[in-house]
Amino acid sequence: MTRLIRSKKQFLIRSLHSVFYYLGSLLHSTFEMNVFIGLLLATVVASQSSEGRDESYTYKQLCIVDDKPQVLDGFDCRNQVAVARWQNAVNTTGWTFLEVETKENYCPQLQAYSAGYLEGLLSKTVLTYHLKNAQEDYCKNFTGYCSRLSDFLTENQKWIQSSLETVAPDDLYWGAVNRTYHQVSGLIDAYEGREFKPRITYELHPILYLNLNGDFYDLEKKLNKTRDPAFEQTGGKCSGLIKVAPGNADLFISQVTMSGFQNMLRVIKLYKFGYDRQFYPGYASSFSSYPGLLYSSDDFALQTSGLAVIETTISVFNTSLFENTKPVGQLPTWIRAIVSNQLARDAREWCKLYSLYNSGTYNNQWAVLDYKKFKPNQPLPKNGLFYVLEQMPGKIVYSDLTWFVEKYSYFPSYNIPFFKEITEISGFIGQAAKMGDWFKWGASPRAKIFERDHGNVHDLDSLTALMRYNDYKNDEFSKCKCNPPYSAEAGISARGDLNPANGTYEFPGQGHVNHGALDYKGTNVELMKKLQFVAQGGPTWGKVPSFKWSEFDFKDKVNHVGHPDEWKFNTLVHKWETEINA
């Protein structure tokens, strides 16, 4: 009987696949057809399976067989170029997991393309969901803006292609850019069902758009896209914290990313490349990310170089600065972040590398911590432990702030610039004059909460508690000139969905919005050695209710394919199968 039921299900799926393929063939492009078929078929398969509840990895590998590359199942072929591990446990943990490892005895471009190709194969279903949720409607009702965006990106891609084709073969920086483009090209080719053919594609593919998602924050302003107030994120985009434990016993770095709830399909990733470690000290990196993205984008990333990197986004209120953002001569943030993570040997070099080819898009405050410089229970070094970098269009400022951590034992990051020059040119002074302390460094709600509560952090559990903190109805620092007189956006982990839709607020991002904290990540000295970190998926819960799509009034307005209904997951530390010695 079980076999009969299973065969009927398989027959139904095959039959529906044929119908879906015919209907999908009526669409205009291969990409549209793939998304259409993938979503419909995945919906049927999901109803017959335990999708999102994987208890172990699925493996694929790229092997050389009879002098030809072949994709095989498993992880132990003889002439292995790359191996990838994938686990979709979003319904049990709030996360999916990916490990990709490439082997040093093959050329770097083949390694990079293979890494992307295997990721594209393994993550295709979840990537299809994420494209549906995060990308599908991006240009809906914004055809003029998207035409301008396409023109801008096309010109930028042409400049990058020209640079890659003319730069000296031994140029280390552009060599890393080349490998990054091979990796994303492999991912695109696998997703589209194309043959394995190591190359670079410069097409404006939706997967490229996913990697540019952070850069779009500012390109939308430069290219005049009008935002929906219900999706306004002026309230805050991330929270970050660097903290030294009492007696210098431990060193923590953590970050909470905030965004629209459609972006909650997440991947905890590890890339380990067989690159020359002399030139690529960050040959391996672990990070929180999203389907189809080659970098964190939160950002939270740990490197074998000993560098841990986070960022929180800074708004550009002085829009005249975008005259400095041009399609020629500049690289988007996602590429510069990857290159800096791979090539930098210390925090200062990371800042120097990241400062090259400033695009003035995805303008962030970056915090770079060098764990090599820290010795538990010993005095902090005088310099080199901790750098902060802030970017605006046309301007980057960075400095060694080891002294700050030594003096105050912490450094908080909450979407407001620290450096005076960036504060002045960004327009934050004028914004604070209009809107008050919400936009003042040291005076905003999260600044005050960090100042009051950082002293409670002494281990990973207390770090997690602070970074997931939101008690907006009772905390004095969450009060505002609003009705009701507080905002759930005024927490270390925001929950804009909890603000009443009929409330009155000082500005849209303070009120009822599709916006909140999507996760938590944090590490310490011991976990950093293995590129591991504590993670918690989904919006914060405990002092506030857990997030449920079925109870969210935006549920019919915001795509959330592949999501669990209730996001109520515990913390975890994912242990890598790949051997890591950071």
Curated annotation (Swiss-Prot):
EC number, UniProt record: 3.1.1.-
Gene3D superfamilies, per database record: 3.60.60.30
UniProt signal peptide: 1-42
Where, subcellularly, is it found? Secreted
- Keyword annotations from UniProtKB, A to Z: Disulfide bond, Glycoprotein, Hydrolase, Lipid degradation, Lipid metabolism, Secreted, Signal
GO cellular component terms given for this protein: extracellular region
Q: What does this protein do?
A: Putative phospholipase.
The family line of this record is: Belongs to the phospholipase B-like family.
Protein name, as recorded: Putative phospholipase B-like 2
Q: Which organism is it from?
A: Caenorhabditis elegans
Q: What is the lineage of its organism?
A: Eukaryota, Metazoa, Ecdysozoa, Nematoda, Chromadorea
